[in-house]
Amino acid sequence: MSSISDTVKRAREAFNSGKTRSLQFRIQQLEALQRMINENLKSISGALASDLGKNEWTSYYEEVAHVLEELDTTIKELPDWAEDEPVAKTRQTQQDDLYIHSEPLGVVLVIGAWNYPFNLTIQPMVGAVAAGNAVILKPSEVSGHMADLLATLIPQYMDQNLYLVVKGGVPETTELLKERFDHIMYTGSTAVGKIVMAAAAKHLTPVTLELGGKSPCYVDKDCDLDVACRRIAWGKFMNSGQTCVAPDYILCDPSIQNQIVEKLKKSLKDFYGEDAKQSRDYGRIINDRHFQRVKGLIDNQKVAHGGTWDQSSRYIAPTILVDVDPQSPVMQEEIFGPVMPIVCVRSLEEAIQFINQREKPLALYVFSNNEKVIKKMIAETSSGGVTANDVIVHITVPTLPFGGVGNSGMGAYHGKKSFETFSHRRSCLVKSLLNEEAHKARYPPSPAKMPRH
């Protein structure tokens, strides 16, 4: 694994050359990344089709479009973000210059995820490059076709010493984590997030951890159930449920459970036809291990829709479970698959209590026509982010930082927040060497008596 040490050393030496300090250089590299994407859309969608069964349109909409938007925003706004930020002066510093200067951290490690292997690897990179860092990318080996593609394309378009790709599995990642970085960005499971954080602690390296959890979705009786169920079905079953901010389960009053089931079924038919297996818009589970895990969560449950599978193609039908026991296995772990449990609660207060008795999720969703219900849900729970009357879309807005809290992660990125995450905000005070008389009082010897105010 000596090559990994050599790779990190190469990135460090390139960073130390100082070339990334130039704003013009950073923008040139971001524009090169833009070209890389636009000139290789077919290859990107092909890799996503091989890894996750996505079609060309889905690949672009779910993965590529948000990265291109992030690049557009960053290239346009970077000169303003990088400006020194003046701060308020005290009585003693009226003649001084006080400001915060954003400087690059150094060498950043980005460990990508397999479920959105393009977006969740490249989007963090945008912020790291914008902030002036060298970047080492570690794509997930689980989505191997995308890992191969990124390793091929990035050196063709970007500086070959500053922006490097390391392929491989657990051994390579383990060796990478022994190296000293200036920031580590990891997207994935909470269990591995703890390993990353422990490794980073040995070097006092700061981390951004975008993890997961069971993101709840509360459906109030006072809402348009047709619209609510259509939006929930879209967010839950896109990418075959393999989305870190997908609604994991529904909380609702028992009186509307059957209506929700029927309206979800209608939406699924509208989206994927009578047989989702034949739909070009419905994905597949990433590998056999995850297929067996998700399939096992359906066992001994009351299936209201779906529940079928085909192991040969790693297909699991869109599945709805009703009257789910909160203690059952499907409610003990993040599902990360096309299985939607419905848990009945008899009030908003009971729903809030249910959510607060569990780990803080990455996202929380609430559907209601009543603004007081929405405000109460937000005020009395905690999650990485919230969307009311829709799902997932809060993470697509560049001006809203995306990140977790507690077990669902720490730190955030997207838009300006990415630039800030990968920058050191350096406090600066510049004083004149003149007017020394005004500073006499601070020097020894001190007076025998305290001055009166």
UniProtKB/Swiss-Prot annotation:
In-chain residues carrying the UniProt-annotated modification N-acetylserine: 2
Recorded superkingdom: Eukaryota
Range of residues in the leader sequence: none
GO annotation, biological process: aldehyde metabolic process; lipid metabolic process; positive regulation of cell population proliferation; response to cAMP; response to glucocorticoid; response to hypoxia; response to nutrient; response to xenobiotic stimulus
Keywords, ordered alphabetically: Acetylation, Cytoplasm, Lipid metabolism, NAD, NADP, Oxidoreductase
Gene Ontology terms, MF aspect: 3-chloroallyl aldehyde dehydrogenase activity; alcohol dehydrogenase (NADP+) activity; aldehyde dehydrogenase (NAD+) activity; benzaldehyde dehydrogenase (NAD+) activity; oxidoreductase activity, acting on the aldehyde or oxo group of donors, NAD or NADP as acceptor
Subcellular location: Cytoplasm
Presence of the UniProt keyword ATP-binding in the record: no
Binding of NAD(+), residues: 188-193
N6-acetyllysine sites (modified residues): 178, 194
Entry GO CC: cytoplasm; cytosol; membrane
Chief subcellular location: cytoplasm
EC number(s) reported in the record: 1.2.1.5
Function description: ALDHs play a major role in the detoxification of alcohol-derived acetaldehyde. They are involved in the metabolism of corticosteroids, biogenic amines, neurotransmitters, and lipid peroxidation. Oxidizes medium and long chain aldehydes into non-toxic fatty acids. Preferentially oxidizes aromatic aldehyde substrates. Comprises about 50 percent of corneal epithelial soluble proteins. May play a role in preventing corneal damage caused by ultraviolet light.
Annotated protein name in UniProt: Aldehyde dehydrogenase, dimeric NADP-preferring
